[in-house]
Amino acid sequence: VTWHDGSELTADDVVAWWERIDDVATAAPYRGWYVAVEAVQAVDKHTVKISLKNPFGPLLAALAALRGSAIIPRALAKDRGNLGAKAVGTGPFKLSRFVQYDHLHYVRNEKYWEKGLPHVNEMTFKIMVEEDARVAALRAGQIHYAYLTGEGAARLKDDKNVSVLRSPKAWLVIHVLNSSRKPFSDKRVRQAISLGVDRQEVLQKAVFGEGSLSGPVPTGHTDWFIPVDKLPYKPDIPRAKQLLAEAGYPNGFETTIKASPQYPEFVNASVVMQSQLKRIGINAKIIQLEWGQFIKETFTQRPMDYDLKVTAWTFYPDPHHYLYQWWHSKSPSNQDYKNPELDPILEKAMASTDREERKRLYFQAQQILLDEAPQIIWYTGMNIEAVRNEVKGYVQSYTGRRIAFKRTWLEA
């Protein structure tokens, strides 16, 4: 297997991947996936040895995950600040041109390891932030593919030249409550908010009903998730007000919700939540931030600065990543929530390789999170993509993150 620049992929490149993730200076957001890894060594040119500090059930899933597992050449790994401009991979398409905020142009990788693929010789990704522009371009035949929201899909339902594709997506849209600061440090306040909101209304208004209610592990994620009919999601306004009064807030309180317009559905969900919170006396101001600033304030800086923030946990192939990564007190990605009852359950599940035991432990962990309510879980979404009818061979991905065109072609 060769890199796009012609050099050979070797075990040393895999070691460089690990060194980059393990380096504190990298501040890798997915370092928590590999907490059990002690060392990664190159045994020979094509063999890698991974040593663990302790048994780690999710290892294979973590290595297979889309995020955190991308290998790049060692030489390129040294240039951490400019990876976006010097993309080198081993995939079916090579990046030939990148015009920031405008487009990316790819050409066929003639040395791709799967013979006969890809089918097309070149491909251009246009950066089109506005959905109206994407819909119009699809209608006019200026583009062949676009990612859409439920609103955009509705506008294309009568277009005979375009097919709208749908599939469940492990995209868990949530509002995180900052459990490290008042008033959200009081469990009763968090429970009041959970009882005071209507998740079905948010699903309908934020994404036109394109999705499903969900627990801490996304609905549809093999057999790790709690069925929707078992979730404690029935709104109870009187009980919510009672809990607020017991916590010392009989008249409610003022708070803020941080969101980024990078994802319109996040803002939509926040607007609906804002309206719902008023029913129990909570007045929430929505603060919209540019995506980079949002990530800095609410994720990377310590302490994180937010009352409530809206985000999404994207696809992970193992429930460990929805539960341990965000909610174990010692995880590098912990979301300002600490629970001595939860930690040992997650540790046992992480150390086990018995699927049934892990399933039992993860169900316990999910029940604790549902009761403690450090996050308000709205829904797991839908992949909504549209293709012109001349596009053949395109298959949707459950991750919602892997857009694969190596088996796609255009029919005249």
Give the label of every model feature segment:
Residues 2, 111-156, 283:
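Ligand-site clamp/hinge motif
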Residues 6, 144-148, 275-327, 361-363:
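Periplasmic binding protein-like
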Residues 8-9, 30-75, 97:
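Surface-exposed binding/hinge segments that line
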Residues 60, 155-158, 180, 184-221, ...:
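Periplasmic-binding protein-like
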Residues 64-122, 130-132, 237-238, 242:
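Gly/Pro-rich hinge or "lid" segments in bacterial periplasmic/extracellular proteins
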Residues 93, 212-246, 261-268:
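Structural transition elements
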Residues 280-295, 322-389, 412:
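Extracytoplasmic/peripheral linker and loop segments enriched in polar/acidic and small residues
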Residues 385-412:
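Long beta-strand-rich cores associated with HINT superfamily self-processing modules
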